[in-house]
Amino acid sequence: MVSVTEIITYGREAIERIICKYFKDSKIEKILFLPSEEDVKAKYIIGRVGFIRISNTWSGIVVVDGVQIPFVAEVHLNGKIDIYLYPQKDFYLAHLVGELNG
């Protein structure tokens, strides 16, 4: 059986890989998961249908060429990952949307 820590680690690493691939031609300065202050134990939200967990939702920012771009990412148990970028919105919107999706 897969532990919660392994699922969380897989989600973070997969999100980072996808973001790096998306911005491959730009300079990524950092990928920060919320809440932060460089917190390694970033908050994620578990999506449920009844008692069945269907996804983890993460929010954060990616700093690309000095620009902060908020994102929300859903990691589904079937391995599918959806990442939504909010380049026109401010930093805190991504966190709010992440909270509302929980």
Curated annotation (Swiss-Prot):
It holds the Pfam family DUF5461. This is Uncharacterized protein C-102b. Essential for virus function. It comes from the Viruses.
